[in-house]
């Protein structure tokens, strides 16, 4: 199942802290936008669009859907696309191509970077292969996680359509979100050996179940109580679980069809591939949430309004049409944001430069 088919199915059914904390207003050098520059965001989190960042020769380095991005210890940016001419494209922060690899991941969807001692590795979720593949940074495959027959809830491999992984930086445990499949979260050890599973699909809302568990994150912001933050996309929320799969609470994001939660210092970043209604094509935007899980900025979308502590419905609000269908967001140590997009005309990622 490729991303487009997975998305149609969705519509029918409708690592340690990365980088430094977002800098407070006034604690970094101001970048004054020039006349005519496009700005997005709210409050202390306003950005200008960097024109033509990352554009490549589409004949040599094409992309299809640009799904996710991560950064390695050398400051290189890894882009995952389901274009089998080069599934992984590696940029420097100026947008220059450094290298590319990968020709065997037709359903490339989820990308996670993990540390093991002095080495780093990648986890790739492939919708079409129904696998999670661990590779080194050059693309050499280390091992594969096949469909989890050990759970007793999967009858055949095609039921397993993983969308995302997260890694516990303490013990290396891997959490796989089967967001386009049976909607379980499956926990493995660092070698890919099954530990447990929880969740499962429900068309009606349930605290313990999901309707498109598209993303998962090990949230390390509370040093004494690490937890899982999991997307429940059709229900427009993140859910918090213990590391062994017990439900804690829900954070409702009305109007926002969120992809995966991304940790950056004390903030959570998220791409919303569509808003208001899942059938509203081209209605995506980004969200930034603080340590209390309150939305503080929505680049490309309407400003967050809270009434009696309850977030009101948000929607697309972008006269410049900066985003079409954002699928992921990554913030670097300079507070700049990179946004790969799904079903957006085979466009390369967008870079946003922090203004304040």
Model-inferred region functions:
Residues 1-18:
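N-terminal secretory signal peptides and thylakoid transit peptides that target proteins
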Residues 30-51:
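Blade/loop signatures of beta-propeller domains
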Residues 51-60, 143-156, 195-208, 296-319:
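Surface-exposed loop and turn segments in beta-propeller and other repeat-based domains
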Residues 61-74, 104-120, 150-171, 203-227, ...:
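Beta-rich, blade/repeat-based domains predominating
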Residues 79-83, 122-127, 176-179, 220, ...:
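Conserved beta-strand positions in repeat-built beta-propeller and related beta-rich domains
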Residues 86-89, 93-119, 127:
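Blade-loop segments of beta-propeller domains
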Residues 256-302:
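Loop/turn-rich, solvent-exposed surfaces of beta-rich toroidal or solenoidal domains
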Residues 325-356:
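Blade-level signature of beta-propeller repeat domains, shared across WD40, Kelch, NHL, RCC1
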């Amino acid at each position: 199942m490729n991303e487009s088919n997975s998305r149609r199915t969705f519509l029918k059914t409708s690592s340690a802290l990365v980088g430094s904390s977002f800098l407070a207003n006034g604690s970094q050098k101001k970048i004054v936008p020039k006349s005519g520059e496009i700005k997005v965001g709210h409050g202390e989190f306003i950005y200008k669009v960097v024109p033509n960042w990352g554009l490549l020769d589409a004949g040599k380095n094409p992309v299809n859907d640009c799904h996710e991005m991560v950064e390695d210890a050398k400051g290189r940016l890894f882009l995952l696309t389901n274009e089998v001419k080069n599934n992984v494209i590696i940029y420097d922060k100026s947008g220059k191509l450094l290298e590319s690899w990968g020709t065997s991941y037709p359903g490339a969807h989820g990308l996670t970077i993990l540390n093991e001692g002095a080495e780093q590795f990648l986890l790739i979720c492939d919708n079409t292969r129904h696998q999670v593949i661990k590779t080194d940074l050059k693309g050499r495959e280390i091992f594969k996680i096949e469909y989890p027959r050990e759970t007793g809830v999967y009858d055949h491999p095609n039921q397993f359509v993983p969308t995302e992984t997260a890694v516990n930086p303490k013990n290396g445990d891997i959490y796989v979100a089967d967001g386009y499949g049976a909607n379980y979260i499956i926990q493995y050890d660092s070698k890919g050996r099954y530990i447990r599973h929880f969740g499962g699909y429900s068309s009606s809302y349930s605290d313990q179940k999901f309707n498109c568990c598209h993303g998962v994150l090990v949230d390390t912001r509370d040093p004494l109580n690490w937890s899982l933050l999991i997307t429940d996309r059709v229900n427009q929320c993140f859910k918090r679980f213990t590391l062994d799969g017990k439900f804690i609470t829900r954070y409702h994001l009305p109007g926002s069809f969120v992809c995966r939660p991304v940790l950056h210092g004390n903030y959570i970043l998220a791409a919303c591939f569509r808003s208001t209604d899942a059938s509203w094509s081209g209605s995506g935007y980004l969200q930034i949430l603080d340590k209390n899980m309150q939305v503080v900025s929505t680049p490309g979308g309407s400003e967050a309004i809270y009434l009696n502590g309850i977030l009101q419905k948000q929607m697309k609000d972008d006269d410049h049409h900066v985003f079409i269908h954002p699928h992921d967001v990554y913030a670097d140590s300079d507070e700049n944001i990179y946004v790969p997009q799904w079903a957006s005309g085979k466009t390369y990622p967008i870079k946003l430069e922090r203004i304040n």
